[in-house]
UniProtKB/Swiss-Prot annotation:
The active site is at 40 (charge relay system), 43 (charge relay system). It is found in: Cytoplasm. The gene is tdh. Belongs to the zinc-containing alcohol dehydrogenase family. Zn(2+) 2 binds at residues 93, 96, 99, 107. This is L-threonine 3-dehydrogenase.
Amino acid sequence: MKALSKLKAEEGIWMTDVPVPELGHNDLLIKIRKTAICGTDVHIYNWDEWSQKTIPVPMVVGHEYVGEVVGIGQEVKGFKIGDRVSGEGHITCGHCRNCRGGRTHLCRNTIGVGVNRPGCFAEYLVIPAFNAFKIPDNISDDLASIFDPFGNAVHTALSFDLVGEDVLVSGAGPIGIMAAAVAKHVGARNVVITDVNEYRLELARKMGITRAVNVAKENLNDVMAELGMAEGFDIGLEMSGAPPAFRTMLDTMNHGGRIAMLGIPPSDMSIDWTKVIFKGLFIKGIYGREMFETWYKMAALIQSGLDLSPIITHRFSIDDFQKGFDAMRSGQSGKVILSWD
């Protein structure tokens, strides 16, 4: 079968032929329809320090997809041939304390699809049936293919009660924009997103977010005053991993504010901890998606009218995968979809 693989320990990604993966007793064989390029895939393409430490070569990459069930392991129940599915990209062990305690997303033995085991940038994918999620008929293939990053956004945004709150989102990448859209959809009062990338801030404006602020040109305190915010933000969603953005968030949070952190900052990031302590801030780290409550919420949000379509900006045939990666690496894109049909 055709597959996009990391074949060499250098920049790039290559189309190759690999065997169709074998179906285990508890697995599904999925024929891939559409895949989306994640920031992780760009890191792997660029062969940065993280990738060099993490990715075995060769490796079929990719973990954002939608497809059709074409094979079912003999122990599997609840699925049938022809079911349209996406799937959780974190394969968990099932026997650690967190798995057994219902906190599966915190499994200390997690294996990543397209990172530690073959991924979805291929004609076929095998995953444990436990990880598959059936896609409702009224959700398109395009939207289903981005459920993995949408899940990061939903998990982050819904970490706290947002109704009537003022929310600051730092980082207008696709996940940050989707998180801001979720916050607005579920009843936040003001949702402000910050970045320095004007292309992506314009995408955020198309999603109906209260204010998209280019912090290289505007002062966040002026925006807060314009919105009538006298006391600061109630909720912070840190999606950028940029130390200056996080420091600004700490400066502008209200006392007792709550922050969910998905962005990965440098390991040596320094902050003024007195602001955390004297403001009584609560900071929660976010990893992946809650299995599978986040997935049900994703489907329900779309079915209740949340429109994510503006975040998908580019669509290519898999034969034009290089154009897709070029678009993602340029910073002038939202989500990029690759079609395998």
